[in-house]
């Protein structure tokens, strides 16, 4: 007769979302609450393919926000709501890291647009983009309360801290990194080896890249020898 062996299991809290099976909006909010992970993956992808130092600084800002949240949680030690007893054992809830992440990112992107560090081809598109970012941030914040991962107070504090850190990190990028650190990085042999660049001064980056690529393609096509049968 085989002996049954039971092993205690745990989970990766970052990607695991619990919700009540009879909640009609539970699955939707579970997906909404994962938006910060999608944004982080998107930023990393941009870094790998664009090699822009400002994008790298945005990612560093997200790490700065997360580290700040970790320190605050360990210092405050306020538990999550009592709905899920197992979640209370995993980590603390004050402040909400998801809410902090989203509002940090939304504020930072908005400030970049207002300073014209991010340019769009139309006037209405940036307004829609900024509004959509804050809509997502509010949606993520609500999902944390709806899924009983945080209290309303924890979400509010996380959102407020994210907004404050967004302003602070924008100042770090604009007044320290961009004038002093970025030129050193992009002109350093290591920076050149990895093709690091700063494209923040280009008026319309999308149009600039499109025009240059198309001109290069035309030049290549003109120099190609004509094949004859």
Curated annotation (Swiss-Prot):
Primary location group: endoplasmic reticulum
Ribonucleoprotein keyword on record? no
Please list the GO biological process terms of this entry. protein N-linked glycosylation
Query: Which Pfam families does the entry link to?
Result: PAP2
Q: What is its EC number?
A: 3.6.1.43
User: Reaction catalysed by this chain?
Assistant: a di-trans,poly-cis-dolichyl diphosphate + H2O = a di-trans,poly-cis-dolichyl phosphate + phosphate + H(+)
What are the entry keywords?
Endoplasmic reticulum, Hydrolase, Membrane, Transmembrane, Transmembrane helix
Q: What class of enzyme is it?
A: hydrolase
Q: In which pathway does it act?
A: Protein modification; protein glycosylation
Membrane topology label: Multi-pass membrane protein
Q: Which GO terms describe its molecular function?
A: dolichyldiphosphatase activity
The listed locations are:
Endoplasmic reticulum membrane
TM ranges: 27-47, 94-114, 120-140, 156-176
The record's SUPFAM superfamilies line, in alphabetical order, gives:
Acid phosphatase/Vanadium-dependent haloperoxidase
Gene Ontology cellular-component terms listed = endoplasmic reticulum membrane
InterPro entries given in the database record: Dolichyldiphosphatase_PAP2, P_Acid_Pase_2/haloperoxi_sf, P_Acid_Pase_2/haloperoxidase
Q: What does this protein do?
A: Required for efficient N-glycosylation. Necessary for maintaining optimal levels of dolichol-linked oligosaccharides. Hydrolyzes dolichyl pyrophosphate at a very high rate and dolichyl monophosphate at a much lower rate. Does not act on phosphatidate.
Family assignment from sequence similarity: Belongs to the dolichyldiphosphatase family.
What's the protein here called? Dolichyldiphosphatase 1
- Its source organism is Dictyostelium discoideum
């Amino acid at each position: 007769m085989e002996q049954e062996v039971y092993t205690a299991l745990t989970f990766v809290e970052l990607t695991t979302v619990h919700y009540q099976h009879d909640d009609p909006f539970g699955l939707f909010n579970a997906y909404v609450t994962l938006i910060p992970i999608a944004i982080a993956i998107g930023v990393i992808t941009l870094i790998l393919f664009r090699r822009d130092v400002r994008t790298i600084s945005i990612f560093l800002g997200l790490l700065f926000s997360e580290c700040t949240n970790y320190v605050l949680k360990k210092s405050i030690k306020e538990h999550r709501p009592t709905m899920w007893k197992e979640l209370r054992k995993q980590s603390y809830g004050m402040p909400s890291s998801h809410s902090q992440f989203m509002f940090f990112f939304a504020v930072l992107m908005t400030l970049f647009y207002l300073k014209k560090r991010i340019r769009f081809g139309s006037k209405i598109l940036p307004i829609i983009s900024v509004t959509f970012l804050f809509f997502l941030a509010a949606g993520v914040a609500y999902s944390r309360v709806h899924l009983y991962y945080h209290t309303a107070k924890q979400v509010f504090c996380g959102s407020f801290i994210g907004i404050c850190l967004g302003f602070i990190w924008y100042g770090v990028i604009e007044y320290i990194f961009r004038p002093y650190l970025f030129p050193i990085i992009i002109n350093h042999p290591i920076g050149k080896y990895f093709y690091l660049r700063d494209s923040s001064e280009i008026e319309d980056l999308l149009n600039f890249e499109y025009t240059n690529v198309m001109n290069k393609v035309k030049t290549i096509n003109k120099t190609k020898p004509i094949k004859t049968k």
